[in-house]
């Protein structure tokens, strides 16, 4: 484990009877002193007993970590690790790396889990190998009440918006296959993770019973910052260019619901075909992603009306030049 991670309890977590847990509940923790005890208790009250709770304190400045330390001293299923503040993606990746369960369940430190959800979700994954994700029906708590009405899963919809909450049970092998949570993206990390896991196939099952209680508080994140939204969309387009091409006919747009229409209208203006040698698949992927990667990656070698940038792709160094249309006067002269 990274040197920057500090673990309070050196012994690995185990179930109440000392066996290796089947389910690892991972919980990022940042300044949730008022809620984290109830969140952990809701997990420990689960009817499914073969579980562990791995909490990663993401540089909290309140008493959150102390609350978890006290719980860990009295229940061997709870373990606390510390890291410098690096965000929930890093915290989740660290938690999974320290965990031992076959199945992974993210739970936020200010939410609550229903007693029956884990048992019901494990039964689905055990019996249906084609299912990759089992999600709960969710109710709001805190400053909002009622049902969180999320639509049924479809890849086409997932390309435009995330409709799978963070709390959903999945297999460790799928986590490893996609490389965990992307630590480059600054928001909507769950959206990126579900795209990575599901874009090549797999079913999503939603259980009909309420299995999770999502807390809405005054500082709950919103996707309204324009720069943050642009960053998220740019990162998703870079990481999942082929997926968006398949589902939306082109990149995800700032007006996400209109992406297919915008792409259909602008298709005549876009490049038509990418041709690369079959022996160089990393280069092929790089070329397909160039429209979104050129302006924000690589090292600029030359800049005038056109720019030249250098990129490292695997073991290769590629030099790419962009060609912009000349200004109106130059077009007339030419």
Model-derived features: positions:
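Short aromatic/hydrophobic "clamp" motif used to bind/position activated sugar donors
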Residues: 104
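Conserved donor NDP-sugar-binding/catalytic core segment of glycosyltransferases
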Residues: 116-147
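N-proximal low-complexity "stem/linker" segments adjacent to membrane-targeting elements
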Residues: 1-42
